UniProtKB/Swiss-Prot annotation:
Pfam families: COX1
Catalytic activity: 4 Fe(II)-[cytochrome c] + O2 + 8 H(+)(in) = 4 Fe(III)-[cytochrome c] + 2 H2O + 4 H(+)(out)
InterPro entries: Cyt_c_oxase-like_su1_dom, Cyt_c_oxase-like_su1_sf, Cyt_C_Oxase_1, Cyt_c_Oxase_su1_BS, Cyt_c_oxase_su1_dom
Cofactor note: Binds 1 copper B ion per subunit. Binds 2 heme groups per subunit.
Keyword Ribosomal protein among UniProt keywords: no
Gene Ontology molecular function terms on file: cytochrome-c oxidase activity; heme binding; metal ion binding
Coiled-coil annotated spans: none
EC number: 7.1.1.9
Protein name: Cytochrome c oxidase subunit 1-alpha
The organism of origin for this protein: Paracoccus denitrificans
Family annotation (PANTHER family): CYTOCHROME C OXIDASE SUBUNIT 1
A GO cellular component annotation in the UniProt record: respiratory chain complex IV
UniProt keyword Electron transport present: yes
Length: 554
């Protein structure tokens, strides 16, 4: 992205110095976004290959005789189950650890959280630089793992992204070990980033900006940072035990030596359930700002919105075993986790109805960011979440495509749509150039139709009893699988179109000549700065009237 030249120091920064050695929070945020986009492209390519295989019954593409991109009915094809497992595993690992959190927390969080609170930079700029390059190392390790020797004398670890033992402890080759190291490094970069965010938020707010005057996106990133800080060390301990079981003869998860594989499930999901809220909370913050801007109204219920995010974060830590209803828990335990899980619907409902109340009576402008916010179908995932929170119903739905549909409505039509909303909302601010509105709207409709075509039919497949993570299925399931795969092709085409939109915008987009190119309801501090912001922002700290409407109108 082109930088605005504001002084002679900036003119001396070459390309290498700026992008490889930068400690500037804005540049590091952009780096996070681009790297997450690259990891996302790899991950969705794996997704499309999965959906190609599942479009029709029988195995057509993933053959032991060799991978194919074109089905050949005349040629023999022995199913390559390891390749299938590898594709499933790395799609999950990349998306969960290297795409959504780095984009929302590392990208938008790094770039805009300091701007929202009027801070000149992050509290620890060099730590910020270290966090990013550790993230690059993590992505590199994950891709190296995909290409390294694994089980069945083939590349990659085919154990699922959750790395459950005994599959993960018995998988041959060192691809599994590299995957564990990739997750470790991902955890380290997130923990360092979280420490930085928390310190910045607590110590570097503009004069007069008390806690409950901080914009909702900054609050969302701050709460997410606490969740990362409290949950990722637990995951680190669990996968270290896994590494020890694989290489040093310990038996933490081996019943033959007194271990217990269910212990690993508890450790993993104590991290894994807060993880889904870490992925979605920054998205909640973005959606709040977008809806407020394009409904031309202040956000409804600011304080309940903050408290709802804090409640979601707290409750997220005490519901982990709802992933484990079928793992032999007592009825008493299941009853507790069932009730606690349904309780999360209350603060989530507060947020959803506050967004609706913000739009109610507003003068709504259907620009591209607002379309993404309106299509933020996290709510559909939330409704199916209440269904599978019931232990009795989960007996039926566990490990079926109903779970896949539930999870992807939360992640794909939730977190991913929030990333797109944030990109279109802020790309003019970050680059100084605006996207073509028609292209943004076309991308939205392609992705919206494609995503719903993929995941909505999967509810039906789950209801019919189709288990997830299988390379083949009976012909009875073929109708909805075919529709789901068509949706995947439409979504993939829309993602490639989005990449084109981003590069067109950066190099040929219409220049933005004003700080605030939306309207007066885009009222956080970044809209007082030039587009793009200069390298050094808020060297003179902002005054209350710059960000507080009550002060400005006195």
């Amino acid at each position: 992205m082109s930088a605005q030249i504001s002084d002679s120091i900036e003119e001396k920064r070459g390309f290498f110095t700026r992008w490889f050695m930068s400690t500037n929070h804005k540049d590091i945020g952009v780096l996070y976004l681009f790297t997450a986009g690259l990891a996302g492209l790899i991950s969705v390519t794996l997704t499309v290959y999965m959906r190609m295989e599942l479009q029709h019954p029988g195995v057509q593409y993933m053959c032991l005789e060799g991978m194919r991109l074109v089905a050949d009915a005349a040629a023999e094809c022995t199913p390559n189950a390891h390749l299938w497992n590898v594709v499933v595993t790395y799609h999950g690992i990349l998306m969960m650890f290297f795409v959504v959190i780095p984009a929302l927390f590392g990208g938008f969080g790094n770039y805009f959280m300091p701007l929202h609170i009027g801070a000149p930079d992050m509290a620890f700029p060099r730590l910020n630089n270290l966090s990013y390059w550790l993230y690059v190392c993590g992505v590199s390790l994950a891709i190296a793992s995909l290409l390294s020797p694994g089980g069945s004398d083939q590349p990659g670890a085919g154990v699922g992204w959750v790395l459950y033992p005994p599959l993960s402890t018995t998988e041959a080759g060192y691809a599994m070990d590299l995957a564990i190291f990739a997750v470790h490094v991902s955890g380290a970069t997130s923990i360092l980033g979280a420490i930085n965010i928390i310190t910045t938020f607590l110590n570097m707010r503009a004069p007069g900006m008390t806690l409950f005057k901080v914009p909702l996106f900054a609050w969302a990133v701050f709460i997410t940072a606490w969740m990362i800080l409290l949950s990722l060390p637990v995951l680190a301990g669990g996968i270290t035990m896994l590494l020890m079981d694989r290489n040093f003869g310990t038996q933490f998860f081996d019943p033959a030596g007194g271990g217990d594989p269910v212990l690993y499930q508890h450790i993993l999901w104590f991290f894994g359930h807060p993880e889904v809220y870490m992925l979605i909370l920054p998205g909640f913050g973005i959606i709040s700002h977008v809806i407020s801007t394009f409904a031309r109204k202040p956000i409804f219920g600011y304080l309940p919105m903050v408290l709802a995010m804090a409640a979601i974060a707290f409750l997220g830590f005490i519901v982990w075993a709802h992933h484990m209803y079928t793992a032999g828990m007592s009825l008493t335990q299941q009853t507790y986790f069932q009730m606690a899980t349904m309780t999360i619907a209350v603060p989530t409902g507060i947020k959803v109805f506050s967004w609706i109340a913000t739009m109610w009576g507003g003068s709504i402008e259907f620009k591209t960011p607002m379309l993404w916010a309106l299509a933020f179908l996290f709510t559909v995932g939330g409704v199916t979440g209440v269904v599978i929170a019931q232990g009795s119903l989960d007996r039926v739905y566990h490990d079926t495509y109903y779970i896949v549909a539930h999870f992807h409505y939360v992640m794909s039509l939730g977190a991913l749509f929030a990333i797109f909303a944030g990109t279109y909302y802020w790309i003019g601010k970050m680059s100084g150039r605006q996207y073509p509105e028609w292209a943004g709207q076309l991308h939205f409709w392609m992705m919206f139709i494609g995503s719903n075509l993929i995941f909505f039919p999967q509810h039906f497949l789950g209801r019919q009893g189709m288990p997830r993570r299988y390379i083949d299925y009976p012909v009875e399931f073929s109708y909805w699988n075919n529709i789901s795969s068509i949706g995947a092709y439409i979504s993939f085409a829309s993602f490639l179109f989005f990449i084109g939109i981003v590069f067109y915008t950066l190099f040929a987009g219409k220049p933005v000549n004003v700080p605030n190119y939306w309207n007066e309801h885009a009222d956080t501090l970044e809209w007082t700065l030039p587009s793009p912001p200069p390298e050094h922002t808020f060297e003179t700290l902002p005054k209350p009237e710059d960000w507080d409407r009550a002060q400005a109108h006195r």
